[in-house]
């Protein structure tokens, strides 16, 4: 029980290793089932998805996020998804490539002018929020400096609720609950301000999320909730993935050099375009491997609506069922040397004699799976590719000597306490 509060990742990993693909954990009067096998994950997330609604943690996050796309279920979720789906159409995302590249170029210029260590997670949070604002909202978020801190408090509280299975009353005078309420109010204020700005200044083409929300004729509260959800989900996962990427590439300079060589050969001194994505396969494999080891969505909590059976276990209605991508992505039956950072395991030309037909589809689900597959995955991957190629072709980023990088399991998987790194300009020949 102590590990639920002190080291959730170790609890998940140890439980999977000792108890197998379904782990039953009793917490007071409540029971949680951890799911750690691709076939069982497919059952929960796709085949029988209608029986599994959003679960612990995300239910509690609703207190801050409202009924946005991340927390809603049923017909409400379907309507919300239909409303904003056009914003994420492949052709529209492709048209945003120049916007993303220009935002990353601004980051490169800031890094070039830096003296001393840079807190890289802070930089990635600012960058991803900036990209989100320009590409999806047609808005400038630079003035809303409290966004990152407020979202961190919301994640902290949601995860606290998850590991206690919501048994701590909301009125309990805990410092984290006070911080949560202050952050919730801050997020609502920012979202309401952005909505009012769009009402006052309609966008010319009306293709952005704010315009779509206004056209949907929802209430101001519904628009606010959708916007808060988008702001969180749209920046946090990409920022966390990039933080882990810079950490792992610092640990594996040979892989960083291969990525640089590809960037030099494909891009030269030019900004990347959407058409360049298929010409940067090694960079894409690096990002895939980063997300295998540190999936941005590291657990997928659900609540069973009716009795079910998973892996031989009877699952009573009302049970908390958690699919755990963090352990799925390290399952030794599907991932040889699962702790090794090896981007080439995603090379389509690499043949594995133990798995001639390839690994199961649900052995790798960094963006979730089934009907609730992450709507913004293509934008996030494009952004990550652009950041790694543009930053690494100009710089080497190195962690401070002796700095201990520890995962922190929030709604996403973050580096605890940030990631300070020194920036060294690369001698490009």
Question: Predicted segments — roles?
Answer:
Residues 2-20, 189, 193, 269-311, ...:
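Conserved cytochrome P450 K-helix E-x-x-R motif and the immediately C-terminal K′/meander segment
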Residues 50, 323-358:
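Conserved cytochrome P450 K-helix/beta-meander segment immediately N-terminal to the heme-binding cysteine loop
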Residues 253-255, 379-413:
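Cytochrome P450 heme-binding "Cys pocket" and the immediately downstream C-terminal segment
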């Amino acid at each position: 029980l102590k590990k639920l509060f002190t080291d959730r990742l170790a609890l998940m990993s140890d439980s999977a290793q000792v108890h197998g693909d379904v782990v039953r954990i009793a917490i007071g009067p409540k029971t949680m089932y951890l799911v750690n096998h691709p076939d069982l994950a497919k059952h929960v997330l796709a085949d029988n998805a209608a029986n599994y609604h959003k679960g612990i943690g995300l239910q509690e996050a609703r207190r801050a996020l409202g009924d946005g796309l991340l927390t809603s279920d049923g017909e409400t979720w379907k309507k919300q998804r239909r409303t904003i789906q056009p914003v994420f159409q492949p052709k529209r995302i492709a048209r945003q490539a120049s916007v993303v590249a220009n935002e990353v170029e601004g980051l490169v210029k800031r890094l070039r002018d830096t003296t001393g260590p840079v807190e890289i997670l802070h930089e990635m949070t600012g960058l991803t929020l900036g990209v989100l604002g320009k590409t999806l909202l047609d808005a400038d978020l630079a003035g809303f400096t409290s966004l990152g801190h407020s979202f961190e408090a919301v994640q902290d509280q949601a995860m606290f609720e998850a590991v206690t299975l919501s048994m701590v009353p909301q009125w309990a005078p805990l410092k984290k609950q006070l911080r949560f309420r202050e952050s919730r109010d801050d997020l609502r204020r920012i979202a309401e301000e952005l909505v009012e700005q769009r009402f006052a200044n309609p966008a010319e083409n009306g293709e952005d999320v704010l315009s779509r929300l206004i056209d949907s004729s929802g209430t101001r509260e519904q628009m606010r909730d959708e916007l808060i959800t988008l702001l969180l989900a749209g920046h946090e996962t990409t920022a966390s993935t990039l933080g882990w990427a810079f950490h792992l590439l610092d640990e594996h300079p040979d892989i960083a050099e291969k990525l640089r060589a590809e960037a030099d050969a494909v891009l030269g001194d030019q900004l990347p375009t959407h058409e360049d994505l298929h010409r940067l396969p090694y960079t894409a494999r690096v990002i895939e491997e980063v997300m295998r080891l540190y999936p941005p969505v590291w657990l997928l909590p659900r609540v069973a609506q009716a009795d079910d059976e998973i892996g031989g276990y009877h699952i009573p209605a009302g049970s908390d069922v958690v699919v755990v991508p963090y352990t799925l992505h390290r399952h030794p039956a599907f991932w040889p040397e699962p702790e090794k950072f090896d981007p080439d395991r995603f090379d389509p030309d690499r043949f594995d004699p133990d798995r001639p037909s390839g690994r199961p589809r649900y052995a790798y689900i960094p963006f979730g799976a089934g009907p609730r597959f992450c709507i913004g995955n293509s934008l996030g991957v494009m952004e990550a590719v652009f950041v790694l190629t543009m930053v690494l072709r100009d710089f080497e980023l190195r962690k401070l000597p002796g700095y201990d990088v520890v995962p922190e399991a929030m709604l996403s998987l973050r580096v605890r306490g940030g990631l300070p790194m020194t920036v060294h300009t690369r001698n490009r020949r």
